[in-house]
Amino acid sequence: MGPRDVLKEYFGYDTFRTVQEDVISTILSGKDVMAIMPTGAGKSICFQIPAMLLPKGTVIISPLISLMKDQVEALTEQGIPASYVNSTVPYEESIERLRDMYRGKIKLLYMAPEKLEPSYFTHCLSMVPLSMVVIDEAHCVSQWGHDFRPSYRKIKSFIDSLPQRPLVTAFTATATPLVEQDMKESLGLAAAAVFRTGLDRPNLSFRVMQGGNREYFILRYVKSHRKESGIIYCATRKAVDEMYDRLSQAGITAGRYHAGMTDEERRQAQDDFSYDRTTVMVATNAFGMGIDKSNVRYVIHYQMPKSLESYYQEAGRAGRDGAKAECILLYSGKDVHIQTYFIENGNQPEEQKRMDYQRLNAMIDYCQTSSCLRNYVLAYFGEKVKEPCGHCSNCENRTAKVRITDAAVLIFRTVLSLRERYGASIIAAVLKGKKTKELIEKDLLTVPTFGKLSFEKLGHIKSALNSFVADGYLFRDGQPYPVLKLTDKAKEVLAGKAEVYGLAFGAEDAMKEAAVERDLDPRRESRDGLFEALRELRRTLAAEEHVPPFVIFSDATLEAMARERPESMEAMGAVHGVGAFKLQKYGERFLEIIRTGAEEPVIEEKDPDAQLLQQLFSVRNAIAAKEGLARNRIFTDEQLQEMAFWRPKTKLELKRIRGIGPKKVDRYGETIVKCIWGDRI
């Protein structure tokens, strides 16, 4: 049996992706390998298939217990003899699993790196004949990486202590050139064959949204994607708990995951999400590598993470099945303060802090750049950039760009006038013409450009400064309170040798509302009744087998069944993702559903919140016109959005919406409640 036979027999695929076959053949030829492949590119198959074909056992060192559990369940379900040892497995049971591996009953053994501490266990492990040691999430070994784990530093000494050195292979989804070099040195892979498939994930669309009511956006988005699995990442435990509470109050089946919960609570939350008992997981970065769920359709970052490495890894939890998925980052300047606090209050040495600030600045620039988001990420990881992707939020807004050279020159001259000694807040205040105590004390009211942008909002000026940093016209120098300095690119503009194009001041405000409406439209993809019937059968089988539904078949495989409608076992075996083992086990059950056909197509209902919101806008605008006041003086758009979502039935409930005081409740409360409920209460 060769690699292609194993691929079809156990995994149900006819062909390999990209460089999978090259990686596998290199391993089988007896050469060490280091592979940097994006999440969803099929890294696991690259070591699982050789493990099946090599004569002795394979140990896979993996960082998170929950990931081991999911992978072993999936392999066992496919008929592959696998097991794991970690802190959840009793000591005697761990030793027994080593005995089973020694006897050839187990081909793949997943192991936590903490198990490599010298002990009787490692003594027993050294007596087990091994063909290969696999280091998964290998970036964890690098002190320059975003997820450094000291336990990974023990791997090389463990391998060196074995009576006979096995093949050593290392896999990761994200690694900058610096981290890649550190991985080679720390794992003893200087002579390894290196495979870089490119980190691009074409099925993912990226979006950055600034300002607005982030909580409301998430509530509406999740509600309009209620049948799809998603992850919402927050920067703090408190934010996780608050978002979880709001989603639960809104009737959304959500789970939460952070380090402040007990092991049992986290395990239960993980299982509920994996088994589709909850559709949304709200989590800190403690929940990331520990999820192997293939059908996550969206990942939303409620707050900006600490680095692009973290962001791309967390966003990469979406669309592992290859189907389209969305990655949305909701950015606010306050997020920078949170991450700065984490860096300043950590126990890292100064050099590590410096690296952390560099990574944080790159993350901020991603949020502020006006260029293609996909290309920005690829360039950061040392990849060659391509044509703009055409479907990230920046590419979609490209037509809104205009010539802004005059404004850029004004800003660059201000930076020079201030002798490149101040940060964005001071520069923006000077341009705005703010006569603050600080500016007076620093004698900055006499700067030639003082007040030249007095007609612009202060926030818009700061946003422009950040965009110029992200696009390479300015750079930050010093931490934690950086000053802004000109780059050669900005100096060319001042010399009249280059023009600057970007968004007009405040243009993002207008586009933000349009983007929200677009994002809140429910998906209209053709998910007919047959697909839903197949999903229901999968859910039933998963409950019978006590495994997550995606372990039975992925969404992509069910969609292929619904599309191709096989009528025989032979035709079912040709469906992408249906292997021989699963065909024999489940084929007839799924064929029965396909032959019977679907009852009726599933039709998405129209979003009632959007209709009510329009009615509330009309009522608010009518009141404003009658009283001769600005609309926001009556109720802000954000307050109306919360009314449409929470639907208060009384004046008391209306008063709970943020920013609505007793006077407004008394004056307009009855009108608002009647607009929402009519004569029903």
Language model regions located:
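Short flexible coil/turn linkers enriched for glycine and charged/polar residues
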Residues: 198-200, 321, 371, 566, ...
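The −1 position to Zn-ligating cysteines in a subset of zinc-ribbon hairpins
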Residues: 326, 376, 391
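Gly/serine-rich nucleotide phosphate-binding loop at the start of the catalytic core
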Residues: 59-60, 246
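Short alpha-helical segment immediately N-terminal to, or the first helix within
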Residues: 26, 301, 366, 560-561, ...
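Accessory DNA-binding and partner-docking regions appended to nucleic-acid-acting proteins
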Residues: 1-3, 356-357, 386-681
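C-terminal accessory regions
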Residues: 359-384, 536, 543-545, 618
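Helicase motor core with emphasis on the C-terminal RecA-like subdomain
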Residues: 2-10, 14, 18, 22-44, ...
